Amino acid sequence: MPSQPSKTLETFDNPRPDHDYTIRIEIPEFTCLCPKTGQPDFATILLEYVPDRQCIELKSLKMYIWSFRDEGAFHEAVTNTILDDLVTVSRPRFMRVTARFNVRGGIYTTVVAERRAPDWEPTTPVALP
């Protein structure tokens, strides 16, 4: 049975909830439709998050991202929708979604949206020589 687009996101238990660590996922084939022209918009989505109790399952993420391909959406709105949906299902300590849209009319658009759990403070990064 072939895979179908889906708005259903799945998670799995974080194997190391006692550690702060960052998961970075790059999705180079995001598409949606321009709500003004109906033309396709293409973007690379970068998802960065510090999981708490749940991690995002990758196949469901792929099908979720694929579900936008026939939907009209402004760049700002779709980026924040993706963030909101991912935060709702996974409840991370921190999450950032960066959407780098391909050029349209001579203009590149990058939208960055992030959320932080109110009780989470990041550790200080180590500065290596």
Curated annotation (Swiss-Prot):
Molecular function in Gene Ontology: preQ1 synthase activity
InterPro entries hit by this protein: GTP-CH-I_C/QueF (IPR043133), NADPH_dep_7-cyano-7-deazaG_red (IPR050084), QueF (IPR029500), QueF_type1 (IPR016856)
Localization terms from the record: Cytoplasm
E.C. numbers: 1.7.1.13
EC class: oxidoreductase
Xref: SUPFAM superfamilies: Tetrahydrobiopterin biosynthesis enzymes-like
Keyword set includes Oxidoreductase: yes
Pathway membership: tRNA modification; tRNA-queuosine biosynthesis
Residues the entry annotates as binding substrate: I56, E57, L58, H75, E76
Keywords tagged on the record: Cytoplasm, NADP, Oxidoreductase, Queuosine biosynthesis
Reactions catalysed according to its record: 7-aminomethyl-7-carbaguanine + 2 NADP(+) = 7-cyano-7-deazaguanine + 2 NADPH + 3 H(+)
GO terms of biological process kind: queuosine biosynthetic process; tRNA modification
S-S bonds: none
Record function comment: Catalyzes the NADPH-dependent reduction of 7-cyano-7-deazaguanine (preQ0) to 7-aminomethyl-7-deazaguanine (preQ1).
Record-given protein name: NADPH-dependent 7-cyano-7-deazaguanine reductase
